Amino acid sequence: MTLSIGCSSKDGGGSAVNAEALHDSISEIVADYPGEIGVALIVNGTDTVTVNDANIYPMMSVFKLHQALAVCKAFDNNGLSLDTVITMNRNDLDPKTWSPMMREHSEPEISLPVKDLLRYTLIHSDNNASNVMFKTLVSADDTDRFIATLLPRESFKIAYTEEDMSADHDRAYANSTSPLAAAMLVDRLFTDSLVSNEKQHFVMTALSECKTGTDRIAAPLLGNDGVTIAHKTGSGYINDSGELVAHNDVAYVNLPNGVAYSLAVFVKDFKGDERQAAEAIARISSTVYSQLSRHIE
């Protein structure tokens, strides 16, 4: 297991992070579980803690965040609004995949604005909505090229759509990221200018309404006054060895004491079930929250 740690502060003042203590606490949690768990934490845009970041992890539906940003950038470049309507033939959609959109729209031809497709992917992790946007708006290759302008080229790869991965589950490993790259992307989303203000705010708001994976990073945060979370999950298949290929969550959290942090947790090749994988993520989230919220008045 490769462990890494880093801590810096741009303003030269005191840090909100006891990086060594966090690193040790997270490493102890990771060691409790039968799988590879990678973690990256960025606090206030400066302090960084990573565990098992040297390896890459299947993103699964986390890549729908990358897709959303690529769609928004393409629409910015072409002067298009997210109100632009896309029409889909129901027969072209996959009835077997996860798709709240397909359940909620029974008409033979489904016409929806792009912003609704994005909401389906970001809030509900809808696979059909994602496939439609890859086919008609921005391809997986073009998404990969755009994200490479935001993140180090070697830190991630997007090669396949949800449809591609459904046809061959091994392809999930080709859509990969380091935990730090995922944490960097969500951190930049909330602190930098990546696309037009209106579209960027739209993506941020959608992530704050995410309905999936509330038993992961969000679990220890829900119900705490003044705490906000925006996140995107990814969930994988069971492979031929009976392992859970991936169980992920990437989040941006604001605390009432002024601390803001991005946290990425990726679980790979897990010899347990989804409940145990979610528990590992929630425990890591709880440890981070406990330390960073310590000085809330």
Which functions belong to the PLM regions below?
Residues 3-6:
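C-terminal motif of bacterial Sec signal peptides marking the signal peptidase cleavage site
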Residues 8-11:
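Bacterial signal peptide processing site
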Residues 13-33, 135-136, 140-141, 188-227, ...:
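Structured C-terminal helix/loop/strand segments within mature extracytoplasmic catalytic/sensor domains
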Residues 32-57:
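Short, conserved catalytic-motif segment at the N-terminal edge
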Residues 36, 110, 131-194:
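Mid-domain, small-residue-enriched loop/turn segments at the edges of structured enzyme/sensor domains
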Residues 58-88, 121, 263:
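Active-site SXXK
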Residues 73-93, 140-144, 196-200:
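Short, well-structured active-site flanking segments
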Residues 93-131:
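Conserved catalytic neighborhood of penicillin-recognizing serine enzymes
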